[in-house]
Amino acid sequence: MLNPTQVLFFFTLILGTLITFSSSSWFTAWLGLELNLLSFIPIISSKFNQYSAEASLKYFLIQALGSAIILSSAPSFLLFESSPNLLICLALLLKMGAAPVHFWFPSVMEGMNWPQCIILMTIQKIAPMLMLSYTHSPLTLSLIFFASAASSVIGSVSGLNQTLIRKIMAYSSINHMAWMLAAIHINEMMWMTYFLVYSLVSSSIALIMHSQQIFHFNQLSSHNFKTPGIKMITLISFLSLGGLPPFLGFIPKWLVIQELSNNKAFIWLSILLISALITLFYYLRVTLSTLTLSSPKIKNTLPSSSKTLLSSILFINFFPIFIPLSLTFFT
């Protein structure tokens, strides 16, 4: 049952993102960020989750620090040309949880429920990414390259020894942030495409985990799944998130690979590709542990709403396969 208060705060959260998206000045964009922050704190807070107070306090302190850096850098525009851009860029990286200022992101994710994790991994990244795309200069490009490389390495290596699914998804989000930062370097439409696909795939995994109430690696044993079909959809979703062809998650990565190759950014591309292979390894570790255990001999029927959700997730991940088939059919 949805809480009416949380629904109201969710709409104001979306409003804050839209204000940042449509703003014509840094001050208005900052106001949108603050409205977004103040709306998300009540959504995190829950009397049914003992860790929500800690997560909301951590999130508030980090976001307040990022906002303070943005405000303090404003007077520097009168004295310096490049320093304010660097400070704003660093503050935005802090707000979105990109490396090397990612330290808060996994612990905050761990203290949330799955629906709140979806918002943190997707909607909460839109406004900082938009503002980051406006800070174009040679110095900020160097910082974005460093943040992208650090996010790819930390997001891939740190996820290897995790046993909590939410932490695995958190480090996966940090790794995907590296690809989005590279896409920002290319053009605005590229990172929006990547972000849209990432949001669809990561949200589908979080919805499956929420429907099965899975939070720990050990819970992925097959008796936690109501039907064997959910196991296969979970496998496909994780492989799609890892960017394995022919699933949906491969398309934006392929576009970024092509553009980085055309721009002769081979070092950047090599770091991203190696990290993508490492993340794919721990996705496979999660999914293989799910598939290798036998299913229970219990007859379980899913409600029609769950069947619709699972069918939608399956179609989304297999969408790239349908494109050439439809083109062949209509030509």
Predicted regions and their residues:
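Core, highly hydrophobic multi-pass alpha-helical transmembrane subunits of bioenergetic inner membranes
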Residues: M1-T331
